[in-house]
Amino acid sequence: SDGTQETCLGKWSFNFFRFSENTTLHAPADSPYTVGTPIRLGHSPQRRKLVLSIFVDALSWAIARPYAETHLPNIMRFFSRGTIFDQQFSSSEYTLPAYPAIETGYYPHHTNIFNLRVGYELPLRMPTIAERMKGLGYHCAAPMATTQGIAHGLLRGFDRVIAAGWTLHTSVGVDSVLRHIDAFDETDQFLFLYLLDVHPYNARWFKCDTAVEAHLPLAERFFPHDSDVASVRLPNLRIYQEQYLEQMRQTDRMLGLLFSYLEQHFNEDEYLINLYSDHGIPMFGDTVGGSIDILSERSTSATWMMRGAGIPEGAVVHDLTSTVDIYPTLGHLCGFPVNDDIDGRLPALFGGTPRDAVYSASQYPGQTYKLAVRTHDHTMRVETQEPVDEDGTVDFMITRAGIYPRGHELETGCAVHREDLNAFFYPRARDFVREIANNGEFWPEMRAARPEWFGGQP
């Protein structure tokens, strides 16, 4: 109605314009520009005003549980009015395979994302949570996300993604979420917040928090440095433990601001808040024969808490649950369809069938394959002699296996030999690895390319 008008667009970033009438966009012929998908305003009674997923990378519930009152007071206060899953376990020991499993409900040997050297995108038949939520009419955004998932297709379905590689601090993420909630308050929003503060890293490359440095005795500041040690194999050093606990405390402090805002601006039935982690960490005493146990209970214990519409209040669930169960649970609560062949299960709390066991596996090419099958009372541990091949398959001909009481996994003299336990665990373990067992058959060229893995054998 006002004719042609000119405006200046911010450089290297998207701008938002509110349209209430038919509008035509023009640009000089030599100035290329991109137009995003329109954001439709309006709420629906079939949706919640806010569904927020908070991904706290590497937050081990087995480690956090004893410190919950002192280091996670805001998280515990908020989710005490919701549900806490006390026996939640990860599908894998680190993020690359564990993250896609959460986003799809499929184990890593089904997503085929487990190899750092191979860029593999999720097949379209495995829609992500954001794709499902987009199909329901939500405005989907990731106010803070990791770039790691982009190439694998994990961020499909989002209308907006603000991603970074390393600096994913809770203080920045919370601010970004609050800004996004305010900006798009006329839409029903599905938001994804990825937090990296808690995740430990090799001290050779990362500085510890000032609070840790200021309080740690000088003697604890001197320790062997090995720049090649990955986070999943960090040693049991006090400096790493104190850094982990301090970052837990700071993450909780910042999330407390977010939770207070939500309680002040939303009714309980207007939101669904989902806080979870992808795996734990082993550096609080998990060693076997001097080596780090990357599938220990602390390493694979994950965090999962929910609050809001459809979530029982004040519930602590002791049923066994897996990170792949998050997908079907959101499907049940939000109303999106779930593939029949996913590995995730709907928890009994929401009308599903309880698990009789949970599975955590390490399928890392060049290293031995490791599996933990856990019940409430026992754990079966499996490890191959052969390393995992580049394609994720492994030879199970020579395998070490044992069944142990929970809390005593791989400890000398603690293996349990009972026919009833053998009859329970062995068929389940065989069924889990059936699709990746190569029965000693392999491509010679593939093995020849990795002589350091296979001793130079063809």
What spans do the regions from the language model cover?
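Catalytic domains that recognize anionic headgroups
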Residues: S1-P458
